[in-house]
Curated annotation (Swiss-Prot):
Name of the protein in its database record: Bifunctional arginine demethylase and lysyl-hydroxylase JMJD6-A
Biased composition (Low complexity): 340-357
Binding site for 2-oxoglutarate: 197, 285
Keyword set includes Cell division: no
Taxonomic source organism: Xenopus laevis (African clawed frog)
Biased composition range(s): Basic and acidic residues: 394-403
Cellular component, GO annotation: cytoplasm; nucleolus; nucleoplasm; nucleus
InterPro entries attached to this UniProt entry: JmjC_dom, JMJD6_ArgDemeth/LysHydrox
Classification lineage: Eukaryota, Metazoa, Chordata, Craniata, Vertebrata
Name of the encoding gene: jmjd6-a
């Protein structure tokens, strides 16, 4: 590695993680040597469905409406990214393009040129390495060519936040790339949105928990995690072993996934999830608001992003009056039963617009879910402040990946 690469890497690390004072802090736990990344240790227990045999209607009925995670296979077989997203080709095509790999203490993006980041990836021994988690590539004249390398899987093409306007809508799509031990800390995606994550190269280890899982049960404390409290690898080192003990509440046992190349994970709104890269991983992920989850997303957007909701409503009334009418029926005083960080700015929907109208069944499903959650709320002990705009029940997708 040349001197300039070392300098740029050092600058990025200092900006993104100022609490880690030197190289010893970055490698203090020696996870590079002592933490097992063996895929065979993952207790993969989430249902898989084949894209070739799963219709959109079946997906909605079997997984989206009941808020059930699933892994979809073969949805990315025709993507050019399968050939184009190798380290060698990315380094050649985007070598001088800057990608976000963290945030500083003031919330500003920390970016690194692709050529320097790949140099870093290939040699790092850091406990929790910097991770490219870039949401702005689609608006950049050169980086937006990444959009040509994949298409949104057919199940996720509702893009209801498109009606909020490109400038006002929250970030919603991310190009993600990182080495072994990098990842995304435990969080819930904001504003009640659901998400999909398609892995092009590498392997990811997931744990998912239902929305009513008590925060204190699955969050690493400061005493336990120190400067690495919010890192995915810290979570798997501290919390995961507890989930396998007989004393762990059975109703909060995690769903586990070993995501392999070509697999797409569907994360319903409100589900806690944590993701660890087991090797060099390259993926794309998007949040989305659909006909099925619209009532919950609308509720949380009004509570957490009132200005956004007003503009969204005005355009929906013109373009999708049936959704505006549904929005009018949502009781904003009742909790949804779906936890999320309403104040987060990294939310939203898939990039591919859909001309299809929502069926009455789709429109009613989200409202039914809210009604069902209200009835179930006393049983599940959902956090009282689950819909507060000031609470911090989760961290945003971006911050949990870059901090």
């Amino acid at each position: 590695m040349n001197h300039k690469s070392k300098k740029r890497i050092k600058e990025a690390k200092r900006s993104a993680r100022p609490e880690l004072k030197d190289s010893q802090d970055w490698c203090r736990h020696n996870y590079c040597e002592v933490f097992s990344l063996n895929p065979s240790t993952v207790r993969d227990n989430v249902e898989r469905a084949d894209d070739a045999h799963l219709s959109i209607e079946e997906f909605i009925d079997r997984y989206e409406k009941p808020y059930k995670p699933v892994v979809i296979v073969n949805a990315t077989a025709d993507w050019p990214a399968q050939e184009k997203w190798t380290l060698e080709r990315l380094k050649r095509k985007y070598r001088n393009q800057k990608f976000k790999c963290g945030e500083d203490n003031d919330g500003y993006s920390v970016k690194m040129k692709m050529k320097y980041y790949i140099d870093y990836m290939e040699g790092t021994r850091d406990d929790s390495p910097l991770y490219i988690f870039d949401s702005s590539y689609g608006e950049h004249p050169k980086r937006k060519k990444l959009l040509e390398d994949y298409e949104v899987p057919k199940y996720f093409r509702d893009d209801l936040f498109q009606f909020a306007g490109e400038k006002r809508r929250p970030p919603y799509r991310w190009f993600v790339m990182g080495p072994a031990r990098s990842g995304t800390g435990i969080h819930i995606d904001p504003l009640g949105t659901s998400a999909w994550n398609s892995l092009v190269h590498g392997h990811k280890r997931w744990c998912l928990f239902p929305t009513n899982t008590p925060r204190e049960l699955i969050k690493v404390t400061r005493d336990e995690g120190g400067n690495q409290q919010d890192e995915a690898i810290t979570w798997f080192n501290v919390i995961y072993p507890r989930t396998q003990l007989p004393s762990w509440p059975p109703e909060f046992k995690p769903l586990e996934i070993l995501q392999k190349p070509g697999e797409t994970v569907f994360v319903p709104g409100g589900w806690w999830h944590v993701v660890l890269n087991l090797d060099t991983a390259i993926a794309v992920t998007q949040n989305f608001a659909s006909c099925s989850n619209f009532p919950v997303v609308w509720h949380k957007t009004v509570r957490g992003r009132p200005k956004l909701s007003r503009k969204w409503y005005r355009i929906l009334k013109q373009e999708r009056p049936e959704l505006a009418a549904l929005a009018d029926t949502v009781d904003l005083q009742e909790a949804t039963g779906i936890a999320s960080d309403s104040s987060s700015d990294s939310s939203s929907s898939s990039s591919s617009s859909s001309s299809e109208s929502c069926s009455e069944d789709d429109l009613s499903s989200g409202a039914e879910m809210m009604s069902h959650r209200k009835k179930k709320r006393k049983i599940c002990s959902v956090m009282e402040n689950g819909d507060s705009t000031t609470q911090d029940d989760c961290v945003s997708k971006e911050r949990s990946s870059s901090r």
